[in-house]
């Protein structure tokens, strides 16, 4: 195998997008889902982690 750069593609050049995948029944997951700082509620829907009783569960 030669240079790895020959295998890189630009995702903008792909002929399908996330909406096409979903319409065809495919599952789409965000790479950032559930990543954050649970100790301060960053992965919750709580907007005021200091004053509310939201949990990260």
Swiss-Prot record:
There is a cross-link at residues 47-48 (Thiazoline-4-carboxylic acid (Phe-Cys)). Residues 1-42, 57 form a propeptide. The modification 5-hydroxy-3-methylproline (Ile) is found at residue 50. There is a cross-link at residues 51-52 (Thiazole-4-carboxylic acid (Cys-Cys)). The modification 2,3-didehydroalanine (Ser) is found at residues 55-56. It is found in: Secreted. It comes from the Bacteria. There is a cross-link at residues 50-51 (Thiazole-4-carboxylic acid (Ile-Cys)). One of its GO terms (cellular component) is extracellular region. The keyword Cell division does not apply. There is a cross-link at residues 43-44 (5-methyloxazole-4-carboxylic acid (Ser-Thr)). It holds the Pfam family Thiopep_pre. There is a cross-link at residues 43-53 (Pyridine-2,5-dicarboxylic acid (Ser-Ser) (with C-52)). Keywords: Antibiotic, Antimicrobial, Bacteriocin, Hydroxylation, Methylation, Secreted, Thioether bond. There is a cross-link at residues 45-46 (Thiazole-4-carboxylic acid (Asn-Cys)). GO terms for biological process: defense response to Gram-negative bacterium; defense response to Gram-positive bacterium; killing of cells of another organism; negative regulation of translation. Has bacteriocidal activity against both aerobic and anaerobic Gram-positive bacteria. Inhibits growth of B.subtilis (MIC=0.047 ug/ml) and methicillin-resistant S.aureus (MRSA) (MIC=0.047 ug/ml). Has poor activity against Gram-negative bacteria, with the exception of B.fragilis. Inhibits bacterial protein biosynthesis by acting on elongation factor Tu (EF-Tu). Full antibiotic activity depends on the presence of the modified residue Ile-50. Belongs to the thiocillin family. This is Thiocillin GE37468. It comes from Streptomyces sp. The lineage of its organism: Bacteria, Bacillati, Actinomycetota, Actinomycetes, Kitasatosporales.
């Amino acid at each position: 195998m030669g240079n790895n750069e020959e295998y890189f593609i630009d995702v903008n050049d792909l002929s399908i997008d996330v909406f096409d995948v979903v319409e065809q029944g495919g599952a789409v997951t965000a790479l950032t889902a559930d990543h954050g700082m649970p100790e301060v509620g960053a992965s919750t829907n709580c907007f005021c982690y200091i004053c509310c009783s939201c949990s990260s569960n």
